[in-house]
Amino acid sequence: INSLLASAKKVINSKLSNKQKKVMFNEGTEKPYSSELLNEKRKGFYHCANCGNKLFASNSKFDSGTGWPSFSEALPGAFKTKTDYSFGMERVEYHCAKCGAHHGHVFNDGPRESGKRFCSNGLCLIFKPD
């Protein structure tokens, strides 16, 4: 993934805000409960804010109570993962498979169907309703 991330930094969308760039290309985290997408309930798809890659279907979104948009499953091939050892813990970070932008972390405490919780920074997503 390191080579993927290196190439992604060369194709940063010029329309991204400074906050988006910090989260997506410096592996930052937005404040909990700050995303406008947290309460989005319409049917549609969530895309990478940098490259437009389709990442999640709205029917996989659920309220995890964490303050970040959460999804039980990603679309096939949407992400690449890497282990994150920051803050004295081991977590799995996920990045857009197309451009390498950081989106969040995936945990094994999600709904029964998948057991996964993709905890996403809302700044990294664009919602497109059906």
What function would you assign to each model-found segment?
Residues L5-D130:
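A short Gly-Trp-Pro
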Residues I1-S3:
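N-terminal low-complexity segments that are often proline-rich with Ser/Thr-Pro
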